[in-house]
Curated annotation (Swiss-Prot):
<feature type="region of interest" description="Disordered">
    <location>
        <begin position="146"/>
        <end position="172"/>
    </location>
</feature>
<dbReference type="InterPro" id="IPR036568">
    <property type="entry name" value="GGCT-like_sf"/>
</dbReference>
<protein>
    <recommendedName>
        <fullName>AIG2-like protein B</fullName>
        <ecNumber>2.3.2.-</ecNumber>
    </recommendedName>
</protein>
<dbReference type="GO" id="GO:0005829">
    <property type="term" value="C:cytosol"/>
</dbReference>
<dbReference type="GO" id="GO:0005886">
    <property type="term" value="C:plasma membrane"/>
</dbReference>
<dbReference type="InterPro" id="IPR045038">
    <property type="entry name" value="AIG2-like"/>
</dbReference>
<dbReference type="Pfam" id="PF06094">
    <property type="entry name" value="GGACT"/>
</dbReference>
<dbReference type="InterPro" id="IPR013024">
    <property type="entry name" value="GGCT-like"/>
</dbReference>
<keyword id="KW-0472">Membrane</keyword>
<comment type="similarity">
    <text>Belongs to the gamma-glutamylcyclotransferase family.</text>
</comment>
<keyword id="KW-0808">Transferase</keyword>
<feature type="compositionally biased region" description="Basic and acidic residues">
    <location>
        <begin position="146"/>
        <end position="165"/>
    </location>
</feature>
<feature type="binding site">
    <location>
        <begin position="15"/>
        <end position="20"/>
    </location>
    <ligand>
        <name>substrate</name>
    </ligand>
</feature>
<dbReference type="GO" id="GO:0016746">
    <property type="term" value="F:acyltransferase activity"/>
</dbReference>
<keyword id="KW-0012">Acyltransferase</keyword>
<dbReference type="InterPro" id="IPR009288">
    <property type="entry name" value="AIG2-like_dom"/>
</dbReference>
<dbReference type="GO" id="GO:0009536">
    <property type="term" value="C:plastid"/>
</dbReference>
Length: 172
């Protein structure tokens, strides 16, 4: 097979829940090589009422995250499906933390930079402690239904991953 016949592979910078290998395994059915990296020129934010963050351009910002190395076109299609239409896949340059090399990768910034739901900083460790279990359970169910389309879809996944507003929670 010549190099022109080989499948195109993608390197994807992730900065939220997809930094967690267990979630990547659910989405891709494998854990690819993962390297730590920093994305300059962006800032990561919480999204009001949601269990996942967004990034938007910010001149002096930087986002710490991971690069998923060598994703196939089919795997990239899964990531696109999960990210939905509120994110846009774009090429960016990140700096690897292990060797300071720059890499051209793809990532998913939030499309609506003026979204009123954009809030304060999003913290990965806090998310793992408070929301990871719920996220993995919902994500596993949605990915299983995507592979065997007999029911819920991506919108159901988004609804499950919205945080409960304590003011609207039923009293016990």
């Amino acid at each position: 097979m010549s190099s022109s016949d080989s499948p195109q592979l993608h390197n994807i910078f992730v900065y939220g829940s997809f930094q967690e290998p267990d979630i990547i395994h659910v989405m891709l059915n494998r854990i690819p090589e993962i390297v730590s990296a920093t994305l300059p020129g962006f800032k990561r934010f919480r999204l009001k009422g949601r269990l996942y963050p967004c990034i938007i351009p910010s001149e002096n910002g930087e986002v710490h995250g991971k690069v998923l190395m060598g994703l196939t076109n089919d795997e990239l299609e899964n990531v696109d499906w999960v990210e939905g239409n509120e994110y846009e896949r774009v090429f960016v340059e990140v700096v690897r933390k292990d060797n300071s090399e720059k890499m051209r990768v793809e990532t998913y910034p939030w499309i609506n930079k003026n979204d009123p739901d954009i809030g304060g900083e999003w913290d990965f460790e806090e998310w793992k402690r408070l929301h990871m279990k719920t996220f993995i359970e919902a994500f596993t169910e949605i990915m299983e239904r995507k592979r065997n389309p007999q029911g819920k879809g991506r919108d159901d996944f988004s609804n499950v991953l919205k945080e409960e507003d304590p003011a609207n929670a039923p009293s016990s």
